[in-house]
Amino acid sequence: MPSLNQLIRHGREEKRRTDRTRALDQCPQKQGVCPRVSTRTPKKPNSAPRKIAKVRLSNRHDIFAHIPGEGHNLQEHSMVLIRGGRVKDSPGVKSHCIRGVKDLLGIPDRRRGRSKYGAEKPKSI
C-alpha cells in the first residue's frame, strides 16, 4: 500500500477499459464487403446453425458478423452495413449485419419487429 507522500507524487493509475467493438472505431455503424458467407455451430446447449458473414470493413478490419432473421441474399462481394452487438452462443461474433440496407435485403412479409429486420409496412386491406 503506498504512503500518502507516494500518492501525492505519482497518483493512482486509472484502469483502461477494453473496447468491445474495436473494429468499429467508435462509430455507430461501418460498411464493408463480404469475402465469405457461411454457417457456424453455436456453443452448447444450442445446436441450430448460425448464419455469419466474414466482413472486411472500410477501415481494413476483418470481422465476423451475424446475419439476423430467416433467410438472406448475401453472397461474396456483397456490401453490408455493420452495427455492434454480440451473439451470445457464437464465440468471436461481436457484430450484426443491418437488414434492409445496401445489398442485404429486408425480410418480406414480416409483421412484428419490422424495424429490426428492414421489413416494409404491410398493406392493410
Swiss-Prot record:
Annotated region (Disordered), positions in chain: 1-50
Q: Which GO terms describe its molecular function?
A: structural constituent of ribosome
Q: Name one GO cellular component term.
A: mitochondrion
Say where the protein is mainly found: mitochondrion
- Where found in the cell? Mitochondrion
- Write out the biased-composition intervals (Basic and acidic residues): 10-23
For this protein, the record's Pfam families field holds: Ribosom_S12_S23
- HAMAP family membership: Ribosomal_uS12_B
Listed name of the protein: Small ribosomal subunit protein uS12m
- Species, as recorded: Petunia hybrida (Petunia)
Q: Which gene encodes it?
A: RPS12
